[in-house]
Regions:
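N-terminal edge beta-strand
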Residues: 33-59
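Beta-strand signatures of extracellular beta-sandwich domains
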Residues: 75-79
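Ser/Thr-rich, Proline-interspersed low-complexity disordered segments
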Residues: 18, 30-35
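Sec-dependent bacterial lipoprotein signal peptides
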Residues: 1-22
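Surface-exposed loop/edge segments in extracytoplasmic proteins
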Residues: 83-89
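Beta-strand cores of secreted/periplasmic/IMS beta-sandwich domains, seen most often
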Residues: 52-72, 97-105, 109
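Extracellular/periplasmic metallocenter environments
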Residues: 21, 25-27, 48, 92-130
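Generic structural detector for well-ordered beta-strands
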Residues: 41-43, 55, 65, 90, ...
Length: 130
């Protein structure tokens, strides 16, 4: 009789584990589609961004796919409205990086290469948010 009770308890335990596994705790990842936004393709050279003017809406995610066509490394820094760095990507010579930003307020967000002398040489752009 003890063997039968143990078998029943083990069977119930296995069934409970199976049910819990099927319901699963999951990874915590959302199954919702991400909020769509704009994606801009940008090329860097010495010493420019092309294009150098971008438009977006408040709260709209923006992605920049930045390809360095130049002969030296560059950065793509979006400055906040407070004048401080909001987000930054470093793009190696011949490389491509993707930078994401969601503007929280309307205004003109400066974009610069913060490597010495690059901004001063004209490596600047603007993200206009309405």
């Amino acid at each position: 009789m003890n063997t039968r009770k143990v078998s029943v308890v083990v069977l119930i335990g296995l069934l409970a584990l199976l049910v819990l596994a099927a319901c699963g705790g999951g990874s915590g990842a959302s199954t919702q589609a991400p909020t769509s936004g704009k994606t801009f393709s940008v090329e860097t050279t010495e010493f420019a961004y092309s294009p150098n003017m971008f438009n977006a809406s408040v709260g709209q995610p923006v992605s920049f796919k930045i390809t360095n066509k130049g002969t030296v490394d560059h950065t793509f820094v979006i400055m906040g409205l407070d004048g401080k760095e909001a987000v930054k990507a470093t793009i190696k010579t011949g490389g491509t990086e993707t930078l994401q930003f969601t503007p929280a307020a309307a205004g003109n967000y400066p974009i610069v290469c913060d490597l010495p002398g690059h901004k001063e040489a004209g490596m600047q752009a603007t993200l206009t948010v309405k």
